[in-house]
């Protein structure tokens, strides 16, 4: 239960960290069940405090942010995420909200496959593009890889423009075979089928994708000009075009029928060919769908009825510590092997040491293990009645298991702050070169991996010592490409200070905090915890993280600053901000605009604006698109300046 705005802001930061690891890094920190519980508490707080909702809340966003490996591609119609329901009471309440207004509504129910959502665009019967969900507005363009998925037709018998959406999955059988191959080749195993599907779909070499035996199961449409009256008719039409049909699809009229089909799926889940984590429920009548509409994040006419976790009893025989890409230390329990949902489980995440202490889990305990969402094995609780005196306390580590560096121990998480730790070096450098950091063109993760394999770099300083002959050793590098990368690396010198601070990847310090820190000059990282706490928007965790990071990497930071010679301010950017009518103004965007809201939000933030999600007396501008609704009325009530899209574009043009 969240009791204060401070706890609310901390929960947002924590959930966004979990989402980043799950969607963008394919490196889950907690199980789906834990995330769902934390998310629902956040949602409950926001429902009670609608005027305090923050724009960066996960309730206001969909899915992942596109990575730098593939080009971004917009969806013609937004890809929404689904609201979850977890029990009969929640389902009954969801149904009643619809049936109260539309008593004759019917519902299409189908298995919720746990894979990667993909949007296929067909024009004149030809497959034009395949794009991952991404943030719902745009995703990664993976067309070449999608064409290697056997059951995706390259052409269809329909000449209109249509977006066909579905889930890319790998069957349980093919997943097991893939991991056996990787084991024999001494390659790291995939944690679960979802990660395998995601990693396979996002391969830069499409021949690898072809070998992975991915499947595409359609579940809906985006933009189209079909004239059907019912959702099920759309699905039947898609199957008639040559796509695979959804198994166990049913049409239901009431709560009882939906519950019966839900429990049928639960009984069948273990023998189902792919992993399931629930049942999708969608209003069948398309006119009712249109009238119900959407929230900011999800459709009101559909939901996901989540499955309960599968559980078994086994024994903890050991504990190891893994170092994630952010430096987070995750304790992992080694278990006596136990079969859950057709998979042999011999490890389970303990999440963090705070969780271990809270649940009083000990070495040699018999424990309850679940596979939440049929994916991540997790220990729920110890069976204390089985204790026989052989149990031992699981101790929180003091040094990194990889580099032996002293760890930063926070209330919940434990981190390795050493930038030179091999377990986190690669990801640190990928972040260092990323768009919101030093923005080094051509230096993506595959290039960085090659540089590590060739032992050409060990930290960010080594990038600036690379020579042409070094890069010529890399795969697919010729003189022009190598020289372009060297030029891009040199061009990254003399960056604005905030970019270099952000590039360091300090825990809890993102782009916004980096810009605040940069206002205090080149020696800002040498400040004390008390001085950091005096800065606007800085809490104890942020201050503590900054002090510990600088203490752990003082020599490296000084060398990097000396080499790159950052500018204490980005003169051109600051000049533009200071002259901007939007500088230091609070702005809310609402209604339908010709561009994604987040694109306008980014433009305005670059001009010094603060973007909020709700209108109040403190709001300076409301940018109102079509169908602006209640926010427009509230803005007029408070005397807030209202700009339509045309007026906004005119003002932005005046600032160029």
Swiss-Prot record:
GO terms for biological process: DNA repair; DNA replication. One of its GO terms (molecular function) is DNA ligase (NAD+) activity. NAD(+) binds at residues 32-36, 81-82, 133, 167, 306. Belongs to the NAD-dependent DNA ligase family. LigA subfamily. CDD domains: BRCT_DNA_ligase_like, LIGANc. Its cofactor is Mg(2+); Mn(2+). Its EC number is 6.5.1.2. NCBIfam families: dnlj, PRK07956.1. It catalyses: NAD(+) + (deoxyribonucleotide)n-3'-hydroxyl + 5'-phospho-(deoxyribonucleotide)m = (deoxyribonucleotide)n+m + AMP + beta-nicotinamide D-nucleotide. This is DNA ligase. GO terms for cellular component: cytosol. DNA ligase that catalyzes the formation of phosphodiester linkages between 5'-phosphoryl and 3'-hydroxyl groups in double-stranded DNA using NAD as a coenzyme and as the energy source for the reaction. It is essential for DNA replication and repair of damaged DNA. PANTHER family: CHROMOSOME TRANSMISSION FIDELITY FACTOR 18 (PTHR23389), DNA LIGASE (PTHR23389:SF9). Keywords: DNA damage, DNA repair, DNA replication, Ligase, Magnesium, Manganese, Metal-binding, NAD, Zinc. Zn(2+) binds at residues 400, 403, 416, 421. Residues 577-656 form the BRCT domain. The active site is at 112 (n6-amp-lysine intermediate). The keyword Zinc applies. InterPro entries: BRCT_dom, BRCT_dom_sf, DNA_ligase, DNA_ligase_AS, DNA_ligase_CS, DNAligase_adenylation, DNAligase_N, Hlx-hairpin-Hlx_DNA-bd_motif. Transmembrane segments: none annotated.
